[in-house]
Curated annotation (Swiss-Prot):
Superkingdom assignment: Eukaryota
Disulfide-bonded cysteines: C34-C93, C51-C71, C56-C87, C60-C89
InterPro entries membership: DEFL
Compartment(s) where it occurs, according to its Swiss-Prot or TrEMBL record: Secreted
Source species taxonomy: Eukaryota, Viridiplantae, Streptophyta, Embryophyta, Tracheophyta
A Gene Ontology BP annotation from the UniProt entry: killing of cells of another organism
One GO CC term, this protein: extracellular region
Keyword Isomerase: no
Protein name: Putative defensin-like protein 152
Taxonomic source organism: Arabidopsis thaliana (Mouse-ear cress)
Length: 102
């Protein structure tokens, strides 16, 4: 009789631990990598657009302190040639797109 009681207690404990784990996973959510284009870090001068890397870094850090910024040309519509460089900010975010803070 004692062994049956110990077995049921063990099974109950396992289910409780699994239930708590599922609740924690649901509240924390999965992280994913987000990329945001920051157009206000680009300047137009003499008909050509340039990306200010210092301004790009500063704006990206405002979005997420762990964010990584880089200036990257984007392809122009309908063409395979590279277009004007724009500021991109890459950071870890939640499923809703908000930055993940640690």
């Amino acid at each position: 009789m004692k062994k049956a009681s110990q077995l049921s207690t063990t099974i109950l404990t396992i289910f409780i631990v699994l239930a708590i784990g599922m609740m924690v996973k649901g509240t924390v959510g999965k992280q994913r990598l987000c990329i945001k284009v920051l157009t206000n870090a680009s300047h137009v001068s003499k008909g050509a657009s340039t990306c200010d890397s210092k301004l790009c870094t500063s704006l990206c850090e405002k979005i997420s302190p762990q964010g990584v910024s880089f200036c990257k040309p984007i392809a122009t519509t309908g063409q395979s040639k590279k277009g004007n460089p724009v500021c991109n900010c890459r950071y870890w975010c939640r499923s809703d797109g908000t930055p993940h803070t640690t």
